Curated annotation (Swiss-Prot):
InterPro entries xref list: Baculo_VP39 (IPR007589)
UniProt name for this protein: Major capsid protein
Localization in the cell: Virion
A GO term for molecular function: structural molecule activity
Record's miscellaneous remark: Expressed late in infection.
Pfam hit, one: Baculo_VP39
Length: 351
């Protein structure tokens, strides 16, 4: 049985970033995607930290959760790179299909990047528009076609891994997540934010699951309150780094700024401390520092147990026994088209 769709490469990828195959469609321009070193690591994000910072204004982190024996259950989380003075669309981290072209300023990107974003959002109209414009080039068959095929094939490979309907899909599906739920009669009822989340493409749903940690984590019957308030929301515009009333102080460091246009003048108003701080450093330098940035926390997560082993890797299928809250969520989620001939999922080893 062929597990690879026509037009998709079956070779094992060494770059797990969805932007890793970016090449200019102009054969006279030499450019390779400047992915960070984590692109070679299959960590389940399917985007490297460089492009996560550049396009989605987030940075990868790990949230360690300790038990009484100092063992760690590590889950992924991201901190957002939006300053507390930013307003409006600048606070949107992951936009929806309705506004992604405006939020990402797609017309300012090269055609290869535009094509990848349109593939992520499954905007076939824009994909066909780009293909039609490329076909008008007299060198399309000789030079451009092979580049377009390479970009398209590599992108489809990544998207197939995050498609819940794909055979042997690797999206996170062994847990229950609510981002905007209300508790009614001891049951979680999905809100508007969960509807927006469920309407997003598979790649973005996986990205949000990786980046946003729950305020409350339930492992079997154990409730862990990680935070008592959210640091982001999901609304009709997408995943937004905002809180009620005053925004959280979030200084953006110079190392977090991706300088794509070094010759462009930029003016930033920043807070700076001056004076002799060495005395304080000598006195307090021995203690552990509290990091002054804003990680993303929102909603509730239920992690199931299998064979009494907590799965740090969430690629395995859920066993059974979903709480009643899940039925409420599925009832409000749009129905997905049923596959023509569903194949049984192969047994996966417990990690």
């Amino acid at each position: 049985m062929a597990l690879v769709s026509p037009g998709v490469s079956s070779r094992r990828s060494t770059n797990h970033c969805i932007f890793g195959a970016i090449e200019p469609f102009d054969s006279c321009v030499t450019y390779r995607s400047p992915c960070s070193s984590d692109a070679s690591v299959d960590d389940g994000w399917f985007i490297c930290d460089y492009h996560l910072k550049l396009r989605f204004k987030m940075s990868k982190m790990v949230l360690p959760i300790y038990d009484e024996d100092d063992n760690q259950y590590k889950r992924t989380i991201a901190r957002h790179l939006v300053g507390h003075k930013e307003r409006g669309v600048k606070r949107i981290l992951v936009p929806t299909r309705a506004n992604y072209m405006t939020v990402f300023n797609l017309p300012g990107m090269m055609l290869a990047e535009q094509l990848i974003f349109h593939l992520i959002y499954d905007n076939r109209l824009e994909v066909n528009r780009i293909c039609a414009s490329l076909k008008n080039n007299e060198n399309f068959i000789d030079n451009t076609y092979s580049v377009v095929e390479s970009v398209y094939s590599a992108t489809r490979n990544i998207l197939s891994l995050t498609d819940p309907q794909a055979y042997c899909s690797r999206v996170a599906n062994d847990d229950v997540r609510f981002f905007d739920a209300n508790v009614v009669d001891n049951n979680y009822q999905a809100g508007n934010g969960d509807t927006v989340f469920n309407n997003m493409p598979g790649f973005l749903r996986n990205l949000i699951r990786r980046a946003v940690a729950p305020e409350t984590l339930q492992i079997d019957s154990e409730d862990l309150r990680l935070r008592n308030c959210n640091t982001c929301v999901i609304n009709n515009t997408g995943l937004v780094a905002t809180v009620t009333n005053t925004e959280l102080y979030n200084p953006v460091r110079s190392s977090d700024i991706i300088k794509t246009r070094p010759n462009r003048l930029q003016i930033r108003n920043v807070l700076k401390f001056e004076g002799d701080t060495r005395a304080l450093e000598r006195t307090l330098g021995r203690y552990e520092e509290y990091p002054m940035y804003v990680p993303l926390f929102l909603g509730y997560q239920l992690v199931n147990l299998q064979n009494d082993i907590l799965r740090a890797n969430n690629f395995l299928p859920a066993p059974f026994g979903v709480p009643q809250a899940v039925n409420n969520l599925e009832a409000q989620a749009p129905a997905a088209p049923a596959p023509a001939a569903p194949a049984p999922a192969p047994a996966a080893p417990v990690v």
